[in-house]
Amino acid sequence: MAYRFEVDRSNCINCGVCMDVCPVHALDMTRTLSPSIESGVGGSPTRDQQPWMMEFPIQSGECIGCELCSVECPTAVIQITAIHAPAELAAAQGPIRHGPESETGWAALSEYTTESLRELHTDPWGDLAGWRAARRQESWQVWRTWNTDGEGTDRLFAPCQEACPVGTDAGRYVALVGEGRYAEALGVAAEYNPFPSVCGRVCTAPCEPACRRGVMDEPIAIRELKRFAADHGMEGYPTPPPPAQRRPERVAIIGSGPTGLSAAYQLVRSGYGVTVFEAMPVAGGMMAIGIPEYRLSKQVLQAEIDRILSLGVELELNTALGRDISLDDLKRQGYQSILIATGATMSQPLGVAGEDLHGVWPATLFLKRVNLGENVTLTGDTLVVGGGSTAMDAARSAWRAGASSVRVLYRRTKEDMPAQHEEIRAAEREGIVIEPLVAPVEVLGRQGSMTEVRCERFAIVGKGADGRNKVAPVPGSTFTIRARNLMVAIGEAPDPSILPEGSSIQFGEWGCLLTDSETLMTAQSGVFAGGDVATGPKSVIEGVAQGQRAAWAIDRYLQGLPAARYVPLWRSRAPLPLTDRIVLDLANRERAKSELAEVSREDRHGEVSLGFAAERARAEAQRCLRCDVVTSCQLVEVKRTVSV
């Protein structure tokens, strides 16, 4: 019999079960070497593939049509159809006998045998102990996963890890949570990221859209599980060991946001002396003064900052670049390298008449005053212009500060808002109204204070290159909204006053410091820049990744090594040898949701999202398909409790 083997690659989770159960070794999950149309590089992905996905070369002459691969495929993506049936082939192969089923409905490979003249009552490949791990190591990990730039690496990584800017091995810490090993889970989550608790609360979670579980039902709640690991694993989590050797060089880092402190964390662990200079009276950058406490507890943030400082990082507060110190001052003090990580703290203006009236606030200034503990009280109706996280934070904080009503004006559709969906839902749950396709054109007032805002409506006129809707003003659609306060949250930019006029370090067209794209070095040798000051506003996790990269570049510079292409440390780590059984739970279960606290105006600071209880966290973690380790595990067991 000859067969046609078809795979829906968009729904394949790369578990390798099909290769395991094939009794005649007809399946080999290796990447084909034919060049793709787009890149011309052998083995690189085509347009309909994820970079890490595998092809499925089939030895069709060996296939006996038993359909074990199709039956056991956890996502039901394999179809086998007969195309012709030469009698001699069918007779030579003989019938297939299924081994006894386990309670889960899946039998190990050694329990399947062929019965033929050649292989009577024997396993196809003799002793199978260790076969799965060895064969997968040969078939999968010597092939290459191709990144968008066409460069290959010698390992495959789970899609969640590929999507994380710092390469957090989410699959490992999720699995450890599922086993109740919380301190170990925290150790994995903090391996490259000194802010697991912070990111467990406010990360944009790019790992979750990449999660293959989302193909079946819903993605794993990876961010919430990181928070759970951080909240419950700290007691047994050891302090990182001191560096193997102390180096004589000293590094000055200007700015204590996620980039600055992430770089400090990496550099001090490499043995360098590190001092962080912060302009504000508190450390943490925008994590401390830009994110409200109901989303990120100050106690949680300070605990992670203290952990970094405990490694030997020195911190000087109320010390601003351009006001209290200069780059030349730091060089005279003996710092051999400097990292500028001052962020993007200046709110972009609306550019409309009347925005200088009393009652018009830069959203970042409002949030800063609230987070520094000032007793900011609002009265009357409040408008917020913008659609990102800053706009949502300002709107929800305005409601807590006493505003009688809060409306968010956004010139595109609600679906186009860059804020996370849960932020928008949380704002609406608190009574905040989202007004899409509306933007202000003038602020009106009397006696120096604003009284109303003239707005116009917009309409969708097509799609932009970024996939978002393009909009245009609707002629004759202007109207006014009475309001006492207007928060402007349409973007932030770096503060140019940090550098003197005539400095060789320049700001670019978009207001960011110019740096070498690979090394992050500025025009001054030994002076680097990273984070929002060099990239524009990004998320916390992207800031942490920038700090990781800056630390790598500074380390190479101080060692006198030549400039090189940046390869994150996590990409060079060897996979863990695995011999334990992995259980894939394919029961259709809803994604777990965080418990929410009752919200009141009186409680301005209590966290709204309370995270998971232990039972819920472990159940959610056990939904993971373990894309991170199926390439090296000797046995994958599938709970086939439902059809998928």
Please tell me what each predicted stretch does.
Residues 1-62, 70-247, 298, 340-357, ...:
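Ferredoxin-type iron-sulfur electron-transfer modules and their immediate structural context
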Residues 317-333, 437-449, 457-461:
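A conserved short coil-to-beta-strand element within the FAD-binding core of flavoproteins
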Residues 231-238, 318-321, 362-370, 466-473, ...:
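Short gly/ser/thr-rich secondary-structure transition/capping motifs
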Residues 358-363, 429, 455-463, 501-529:
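Flexible glycine/proline-rich, aromatic-decorated loop/lid segments
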Residues 253-277, 316-328, 346-349, 365-421, ...:
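Rossmann-like dinucleotide/flavin-binding elements
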Residues 97, 276, 280-311, 315, ...:
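Rossmann-like dinucleotide-binding cores of NAD(P)H-dependent redox enzymes
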